[in-house]
């Protein structure tokens, strides 16, 4: 299963473990620098420098995803460590499965600081059969069938990590009440992100 690191919850050699502390609990992820080096470097540097501390999940759509990482909390803000937007790092080894940590963007090669965590729990059966026909690897099709996810975002958003603990926190955040533009009525705050290398 080495080809598909998301299918294994153990932190493997070369992966980076991070713990995201929120006011709704903790979520633990493993990041994939071998798959998305610039994206992981961007996230880890921001995490270590406290860039994400106090930032909210400004967009929460239950049974789809939770999005954060924007200091302006508008969906329009946030910068990369590289000064401008940076390129996508798509891979045939990482997919937008349930619990994937993935980059938000506004089109090709527009990555900054915003990210989302996939929270869709079921992929429709007709879509699963299309994935197999469309060239998705069978272990990934099976994982989408078992875990859920958002396969239509594959090759459109860079996947650079996977939740390995704290799914209950992800669900709690996803179930928060929201108002206009899917913004939570009560702030869901990222207090800090610890990097364990």
Swiss-Prot record:
Record-given protein name: Putative peptidyl-prolyl cis-trans isomerase
Annotated disulfide bonds: none
Family: Belongs to the cyclophilin-type PPIase family.
PANTHER family: PEPTIDYL-PROLYL CIS-TRANS ISOMERASE-RELATED, PEPTIDYLPROLYL ISOMERASE DOMAIN AND WD REPEAT-CONTAINING PROTEIN 1
EC number(s) per entry: 5.2.1.8
A UniProt-annotated Pfam family: Pro_isomerase
Domain PPIase cyclophilin-type: 14-195
Catalyzed reaction equations: [protein]-peptidylproline (omega=180) = [protein]-peptidylproline (omega=0)
Function according to Swiss-Prot or TrEMBL: PPIases accelerate the folding of proteins. It catalyzes the cis-trans isomerization of proline imidic peptide bonds in oligopeptides.
UniProt keyword list: Isomerase, Rotamase
BP GO terms, sorted: protein folding
InterPro entries listed in its UniProt record: Cyclophilin-like_dom_sf, Cyclophilin-type_PPIase, Cyclophilin-type_PPIase_dom, Cyclophilin_A-like
Organism: Staphylococcus aureus (strain NCTC 8325 / PS 47)
Top-level taxon in the UniProt lineage: Bacteria
GO molecular function: peptidyl-prolyl cis-trans isomerase activity
């Amino acid at each position: 299963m080495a080809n598909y690191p998301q299918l294994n919850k153990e932190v493997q050699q070369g992966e980076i473990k991070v713990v995201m502390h929120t006011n709704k609990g903790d979520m633990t992820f493993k990041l994939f620098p071998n798959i998305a080096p610039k994206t992981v470097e961007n996230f880890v540097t921001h995490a270590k420098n406290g860039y994400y501390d106090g930032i909210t999940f400004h967009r929460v759509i239950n049974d789809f995803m939770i999005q954060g990482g924007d200091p302006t909390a508008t969906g329009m803000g946030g910068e990369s460590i590289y000064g401008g937007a940076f390129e996508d790092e798509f891979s045939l080894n990482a997919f937008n499965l349930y619990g994937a940590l993935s980059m938000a963007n506004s089109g090709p090669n527009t990555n900054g600081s915003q990210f989302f965590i996939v929270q869709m729990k079921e992929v429709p059966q007709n879509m699963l059969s299309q994935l197999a026909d469309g060239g998705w690897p069978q272990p990934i099709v099976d994982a989408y069938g078992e875990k859920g996810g958002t396969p239509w975002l594959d090759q459109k958003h860079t996947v650079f990590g996977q939740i390995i603990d704290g799914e209950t926190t992800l669900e709690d955040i996803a179930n928060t009440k929201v108002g206009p533009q899917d913004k939570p009525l009560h702030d869901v705050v990222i207090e800090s992100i610890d990097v364990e290398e």
